[in-house]
Amino acid sequence: MLTKTRAVVLKEVKFREQSKICSLYTRDFGRISVILKGGRNLKSRLSGLFCTGSLLEVVLYNRSNRDLQLVSEARIIRSPMTAEPSMERFSAIYRLIEILKISTGNEEKNIRLFNALERTLEKLCAPCRNADAAVAWFMLKLISESGFEPSIEQCVTTGKSILPMLQEGSADDLCLTYDPGGVSLPVPAAQKGPPGQRLPVQVYLLMRTLNRLDIRSIDEIDIPADNSRLLCDILQNYCSLHNNYNPSSKNRRIISRILYE
């Protein structure tokens, strides 16, 4: 069946002399694998289109009983290469693709998640002041759509509203717990709280803001780069744990050195 859909390229692998196999996250079919016959031939109309992180409109022959779908046509909608080169943007897109690969299953359709991904790539494929914050915004949507959205407004251990406690100066640090999933006020040293990650107050406030924000407004707020980067790390660890996956911290450290040292 010949069908049209939108897709984000998650991975590309050379196949034989001139072809390519790609993993795509699509709007209408979830994650699928496709083959581009002759797609590496410079004369092919598919040549140069299927690059990791690109948002495409694709026409493919889709058969439910086939592991590899055949691409007929494609056009680029958004590409990381269209804006001025930026290691910060490339790092953010790499993180976005990494978390998508571990969090989405084959042929699991989720239009709301794809729409959030499309809006995020629209922001990242243009000049963007807050690339890490855009990825953190997407991770919050991904976590929500995956069914393990953390409680952000109320402490998961006491049930108390967190913001009034912070305004009273009752806490310097918080914790993002895994089970139950949510933000927790500090637990006295003599007590054992649920496992989780340290969540600095300023990073918590950023998470709370992004959870309520339209991504189109993300460049209108002043976000310290260290806070958005740390929030990305915390959310990626949270998401990875719920997907029973150990994130590649080595790759993240390498990229951080390139960007910030």
Swiss-Prot record:
Lineage per the UniProt record: Bacteria, Pseudomonadati, Chlorobiota, Chlorobiia, Chlorobiales
HAMAP family reported for this sequence: RecO
InterPro entries: ARFGAP/RecO, DNA_rep/recomb_RecO_N, NA-bd_OB-fold, RecO, RecO_C
Gene3D superfamilies in alphabetical order: Nucleic acid-binding proteins (2.40.50.140), Recombination protein O, C-terminal domain (1.20.1440.120)
NCBIfam families, A to Z: reco
Gene Ontology cellular component list: bacterial nucleoid
Protein name: DNA repair protein RecO
PANTHER family in UniProt: DNA REPAIR PROTEIN RECO (PTHR33991:SF1)
Recorded family membership: Belongs to the RecO family.
Entry function: Involved in DNA repair and RecF pathway recombination.
Entries under Pfam families matching the protein: RecO_C (PF02565), RecO_N (PF11967)
UniProt keyword DNA repair, yes or no: yes
